[in-house]
């Protein structure tokens, strides 16, 4: 889908200034849905990015057993993913691994990566909003409980310091893996792309 910028021409500088003022006012209006998520059929993975396809194929080959992941596949995938495990009381899912080349690491920075281990998935930190953290956490919990992969298209509003907010569309694959000790972990594989089947919620 192609999007074209819209240019307005006003003969009067007064009306142009009025229009600019109205647009600026709209930018401060809170959006009803800053994060939109669509769960897709697993059959759609064949049309996904190569990273998502490789992650799904590796999960299928290993039958969800982490120790049976092909070492070359693991070396290729692990720098790009997030991993979540239950905490000691098994009450919350927490970050147990953040790949340095993951989208989350690139957006939030090195300090966030270093502080992320042990953080609860549904609580906002870094540049996340609480609404975003809670919405994306639902998929982690579903995958952890069911053991079934989730392939999703997501569009979310990203707000960074000293930058204009922007919409980031991406696809996400969640898979559950059995670890060597017998516990479970959810691996989150994200790939930013414009080819997501989620309507644009509006302009920030």
Q: At which residue positions do the language-model features occur?
A:
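Sensory/regulatory domains in signal-transduction proteins
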Residues: 1-42, 72-204
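Glycine-rich short-loop/terminal segments
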Residues: 40-71
